[in-house]
């Protein structure tokens, strides 16, 4: 059995895990197109309430009874095969589609699909691009992996041919997409619970590039050797950017006291515009250049680019300011890969704080084990590290790796590091060791943010 989104408007679609960031956006697009939508989630949330208001039938908890008069069931990689709704869908011979395949179906209904790929920076860059597209009145449909203030959440349903989405490489999910413009920000070893090695990852990105039609475009980071290697297979138009290389470059870069950059953008030797960003870090200078490349492709004028990028203050959980208490600043960041952590700490170091205390929660046993040596070396820019237990996410603890082992190695490397085993223990350390003018930085993709929230409250 198959499902064609453009023809099967009478089909009723059910989402398992509808409250998730990615699934909720897909559900909203369908509701706007006139589909009957239902979905289940483990708990009620702002997202499920918003979807209910828009006409979705929401079930809290998973049960075979939730599949009432349903034709298509959509699920994510996080849903186990013994989920009662998956079992019921198979028993009833319903159409079962994973999230990536279903998103690909939605993309078929748009001409100008923009897919933002890369190991790091997808959410921030997708958000930047969304700001520029909205500033240019393109009326895009947007699916982003974090909450974005300008669209009041993680999705926006537009009424144009423009569709902007993140493209995650995990389990090769982005190979189900239909991009007209692909963007590759960077390529590093990650998701090694699925990929064999970096060559396997590069081969998958090459397949992504081959998806783009001959009249389409691939935008790539010319400062990243692995990206440039991948772009060699392109049969479509190629546009590159970088701080030091590429068709589009940033020059005359200066940072203010908040770590945010002002710079000039050149295409070859022609100055296109000057930009002042409202998000910190050199990595965001690079990310913003990919948005300029896209603007060049879609003939967006300089005023809209400047307006869009200068108005972007960051996506939630991406170097997000959480508050200040006793003149101690609290910032939360989603970084969970050594490259991301180094970029986050480098950004923090450009700000004028007396001391940087980083509370880090490793994310998944596989990532911690496979990138162990990189994790040991990525905290050099913090003054003190508070290391929490590994956040398991979708994995089981096989007893092969733990945070105490990582902490020992980090201490041997010369970084002041303290292991803690609960949010409360982390809070005790923070309360005892931070003083006026310091920065508390919570880092990770799990629930480490609670430490900063406990401190502020």
From Swiss-Prot:
The organism's place on the tree of life at top rank: Bacteria
Catalytic activity: UDP-N-acetyl-alpha-D-muramate + L-alanine + ATP = UDP-N-acetyl-alpha-D-muramoyl-L-alanine + ADP + phosphate + H(+)
Record keywords, A-Z: ATP-binding, Cell cycle, Cell division, Cell shape, Cell wall biogenesis/degradation, Cytoplasm, Ligase, Nucleotide-binding, Peptidoglycan synthesis
Principal location class: cytoplasm
GO BP, sorted A to Z: cell division; cell wall organization; peptidoglycan biosynthetic process; regulation of cell shape
A Pfam family reported for this protein in Swiss-Prot or TrEMBL: Mur_ligase
SUPFAM superfamilies assigned: MurCD N-terminal domain (SSF51984), MurD-like peptide ligases, catalytic domain (SSF53623), MurD-like peptide ligases, peptide-binding domain (SSF53244)
Family matches, as InterPro entries: Mur-like_cat_sf, Mur_ligase_C, Mur_ligase_C_dom_sf, Mur_ligase_cen, Mur_ligase_N, MurCDEF_pg_biosynth, UDP-N-AcMur_Ala_ligase_MurC
Gene Ontology, cellular component aspect: cytoplasm
Database matches in HAMAP family: MurC
Function comment: Cell wall formation.
Record protein name field: UDP-N-acetylmuramate--L-alanine ligase
Organism: Clostridium perfringens (strain ATCC 13124 / DSM 756 / JCM 1290 / NCIMB 6125 / NCTC 8237 / Type A)
